[in-house]
Amino acid sequence: MMHYDVAVIGGGIAGYSAALRALQAGKKVVLINQGQSALHFSSGSIDVLGRLPDGSVVNQPFDALSALQQQVPEHPYSKVGRKNSEKGLMWFKRTLDSAHVPLHHEPDGANHWRITPLGTLKNTWLSQPFVYPYRGNADFSRIVIVAIDGYRDFQPAMLRDNLAQRPELANTPMLTVNVSIPGFEGFRRNPNELRSIDIARLLRQESAWNALCDQLMRVARPDDLVIMPAIMGNGDGLHLMTKLQQVTQLRFHEVPTMPPSLLGIRIEEALHRSFIQGGGVQLKGDKVIGGDFAGSRLTAIHTQNLRDFPISAEHYVMATGSYFSQGLQASQHAIQEPTFALDVQQNPDRAQWRHAQFIAAQSHPFMTFGVITDANLHPSRQGKTIDNLWCCGAMLSGYDPVFEGCGGGVAIATAYHAVEQILATYAQTKQPEVLL
């Protein structure tokens, strides 16, 4: 049997955050994840809280946590608390900074808007260096939207039309420019087959790189905001964006595209690299299929690939995600947590799972369904609390990450809080030194 201090189940942003925090504290950590995480579909920014459950727009996310606690006492943020939530987010920022993916937030702690691929504005709190933090006061003379010939996952006309409907941008000139990058012929079989990964590989060629720079400098000025799809990477995306800015002297705003999202991949690669370089053990491509319980403790877990070799740990952190990652499974009449059959908060009346209108002004109830935890994020199984198991991230009940704009923030805050409690147990059991 393989034994660890901490076993983390799930390799999304919550799982990696928990594993890294434990590893940084000197613990022996194993991370088990089934495959690619939802970070490959993400914006690459970290949303803390964009809207309260009653629909009120949030400007200062941490200040709003007291109002959130009054509205939803069982919200994950309500269990973690403001102080620990802030500590967790700042820890994550420092961790990514040290992994060469610096994230920025506004000096006053407020949310900023990021311009989305659809030309809408979305509240967020931490963004990557080439995501423009819009606060409603444009400090650019024009918006230049870059379309790349043959690239099908970016719709510049839609972005421009939606952005032009913003009252504060009504008098800001917007233009769309097409750029061609030589060398596409070897990557595609039809005119619109290219993906962001294809372009990223192509731009490693000097001729393609120089062609892109030359065309951008001809159509844009230093006082413009140049919006372009995230096509730089993978592995060296931020380095290439910095180089592009230095060569062209332009101000860029990267927008994520259809999957794979290079902005999200940057974060996952940074987390993975930090975990492996720090000495963590990762079982990638494996899946936890069950566990052994003794009283109120989880004593061992079993994986699909290591059926005859159970994994044991002093503490377990579970971050298997929601429906998308199969951390929760929905049948016609019930929601289940499939790995350990943990207790799930849900409404037994299927008709109450959603509103009559798909696009509604409020959260659909099923989005708040998830694993029930106590104030310390311990789940229960058949009504019995599991004392050495913590749950975090999208599998938790009591919140809607989409409606509230808080998915990344909750994932990081709950993972950090779970591991801080684990570390506290070691501090409590540490024997005092005897001075002779």
Curated annotation (Swiss-Prot):
Keyword flag Flavoprotein: yes
Keywords, in A-Z order: Flavoprotein, FMN, Oxidoreductase
A GO BP term here is: glycerol catabolic process
List, alphabetically, the SUPFAM superfamilies matched: FAD/NAD(P)-binding domain
GO CC terms for this protein? glycerol-3-phosphate dehydrogenase (FAD) complex
Q: Which Pfam families match?
A: FAD_binding_2
Q: Which GO terms describe its molecular function?
A: glycerol-3-phosphate dehydrogenase (quinone) activity
Checking InterPro entries in the record gives:
FAD-dep_OxRdtase_2_FAD-bd, FAD/NAD-bd_sf, G3P_DH_GlpB_su, Metab_Enz_Cyan_OpOx_G3PDH
Q: Which cofactor does it need?
A: FMN
Known EC number(s)? 1.1.5.3
Q: Does the keyword Cytoplasm apply?
A: no
Q: Can you state which reaction this protein catalyses?
A: a quinone + sn-glycerol 3-phosphate = dihydroxyacetone phosphate + a quinol
Pathway the protein acts in: Polyol metabolism; glycerol degradation via glycerol kinase pathway; glycerone phosphate from sn-glycerol 3-phosphate (anaerobic route): step 1/1
- What do we know about how this protein assembles, alone or with others? Composed of a catalytic GlpA/B dimer and of membrane bound GlpC.
Q: Which family does it belong to?
A: Belongs to the anaerobic G-3-P dehydrogenase subunit B family.
Q: What does this protein do?
A: Conversion of glycerol 3-phosphate to dihydroxyacetone. Uses fumarate or nitrate as electron acceptor.
The protein depicted here goes by the name Anaerobic glycerol-3-phosphate dehydrogenase subunit B
Q: What is the lineage of its organism?
A: Bacteria, Pseudomonadati, Pseudomonadota, Gammaproteobacteria, Vibrionales
User: Which gene carries the instructions for this protein?
Assistant: glpB
